[in-house]
């Protein structure tokens, strides 16, 4: 399975007569991203939510349910709840406003959100390029730190064969965050995974500061890639789906995208009644 909005769901389609299944080329994957963005554009969307894959999508769902206020003002946090309250009636922050939504409507709204999420795989840069080319107003990327940490080093194709830079990014961010602990830096450099490196940073009490530096760097690289033709933002999560942080413009883009999704759902409901 790759993308339900394109009808690729619950299996694979084998084209041709040989019966031999071959992996999709990078070109085919990028064209799939383009097709999804074209679908959203045809629906009148201006704001994009992109995820690397199922993990990022799942983490984002959890984020929307919990409506965290970290890195946001009170108004911004409540704004996100206002836009997402109908996605899950069990959200403790949003349940009081959501009594009119029945379970079947919830399911439809969640499906609508899932269909709106653009699966970009490793192609961060290409996804931004296409979104800018098609005239979108902004894109927010959500996913696991282990994948998105590379953006802090300007790496826009996150496949392992293209580049790594994970530990170098975290090490330099820790230095910029103010650490002078050489032993900590050696531990980061010697870590096998991003999670291991972040554990060392957490034990040293400098994880949050390091992530803040990383997010500023990532924001710069995303804006540089977009040539400022559209707003860009990013939200990162830990291995267990815990919210780690977001870039400055992420909340605004997310709210705009969810507002569009809500309006589309209302229009579809009205069409269905007719």
Regions found by a protein language model. Give the residues of each.
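N-terminal loops that bind phosphate or other acidic moieties
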Residues: 1-77, 81-83, 102-137, 147-274
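Basic polycationic patches enriched in arginine
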Residues: 81, 89, 94-97, 273-274
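Short acidic/histidine-rich active-site segments
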Residues: 143
């Amino acid at each position: 399975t790759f993308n339900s909005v394109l009808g690729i769901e619950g299996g694979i389609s084998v084209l041709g007569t040989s019966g031999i299944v071959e992996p999709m080329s990078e070109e085919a994957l990028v064209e799939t991203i383009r097709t999804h963005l074209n679908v959203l554009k045809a629906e009148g969307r201006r704001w994009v939510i992109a995820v690397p894959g199922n993990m990022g999508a799942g983490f984002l769902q959890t984020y929307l349910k919990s409506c965290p206020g970290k890195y946001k003002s009170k108004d911004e946090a409540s704004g996100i709840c206002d836009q997402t309250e109908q996605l899950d009636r069990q959200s403790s922050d949003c349940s009081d406003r959501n009594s009119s939504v029945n379970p079947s409507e919830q399911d439809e709204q969640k499906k609508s959100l899932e269909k709106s999420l653009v699966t970009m795989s490793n192609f961060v840069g290409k996804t931004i390029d296409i979104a800018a080319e098609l005239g979108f107003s902004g894109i927010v990327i959500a996913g696991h730190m282990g994948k998105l940490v590379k953006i802090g080093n300007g790496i826009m194709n996150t496949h392992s064969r293209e580049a790594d830079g994970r530990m170098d990014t975290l090490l330099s961010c820790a230095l910029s965050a103010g650490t002078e602990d050489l032993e900590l830096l050696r531990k980061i450099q010697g870590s096998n995974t991003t999670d291991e490196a972040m554990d060392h940073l957490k034990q040293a009490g400098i994880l949050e500061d390091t992530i803040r530096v990383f997010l500023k760097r990532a924001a710069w690289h995303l804006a540089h890639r977009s040539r400022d033709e559209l707003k860009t933002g990013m939200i990162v999560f830990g291995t267990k789906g815990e919210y780690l942080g977001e870039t400055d413009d992420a909340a605004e883009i997310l709210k705009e995208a969810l507002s569009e999704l809500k309006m589309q759902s209302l229009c579809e409901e009205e069409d269905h009644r007719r």
